[in-house]
């Protein structure tokens, strides 16, 4: 059960409306297939929370509905090969990647030290090192979601991890699990003390290079969007996250409150953008 009925501004949750929801999370393979999922029985729950529902798919469910967010679920086509991926990047992106790699190498004795962890034994070594980096990240401070503290959630047969070192100090990590035909972009972070060296970007490029030619067809950037995803992805599928509740006045009121709050936040953002634009034009 999950409770996504949260009044949020950015990553900060201001309040929540309690509802017990059955989460139905579509994999990238399922999203690309384009069909709506079969919804499980609710039992005592208040509704469903369906993530990565393809835009063209229609759920077989009645009741008040709220589209929490729309986005393109982006991915890298690993099966096409590294050369095709790099050719699809913009010239500016390729130049930026080279520049960041050179800068980090210069700070580390002339080389980039990325280590890959594939087996359970290797991932057992990866976990405490990655946790040390995760403890420094904003994801950990604000959300507590940087990387599982329990090693059992990381040391798995269907997972892979990478660490970027400066000297002998780990400064960035990436941990992925396998789902269907894709590697998932599950956990990533870097030590903010090294942010000027762009360790996350350098590590991401190294990890993708390692995955090309492997058994998986895609690297899945998961739900949501972001500049780095748009920059690196070679494909995507338009999706939405949807909440469907049982039919009653309380649930309709709850979703009405969510829509009203989201609309107010969006309007405030538009006003802020217009004021900033007016300020620049007035100089």
Where are these regions (language model features)?
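Conserved GNAT acetyl-CoA-binding A-motif
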Residues: 44-52, 211-223
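A conserved beta-strand-loop-helix scaffold within acyl/acetyltransferase catalytic domains
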Residues: 2-16, 53-56, 62-77, 81-83, ...
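C-terminal structured domain segments across diverse proteins
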Residues: 152-164, 169, 203, 207-211, ...
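Long, C-terminal catalytic modules of enzymes
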Residues: 277-283
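Conserved acetyl-CoA-binding loop-helix of GNAT-fold acetyltransferases
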Residues: 34-38, 196-209
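N-terminal accessory interaction module
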Residues: 3-51
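Hydrophobic alpha-helix feature that most strongly marks membrane-spanning transmembrane helices
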Residues: 135, 169, 175, 203, ...
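Active-site/acyl-donor-binding loops of N-acyltransferases
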Residues: 2-21, 62-84, 215-276
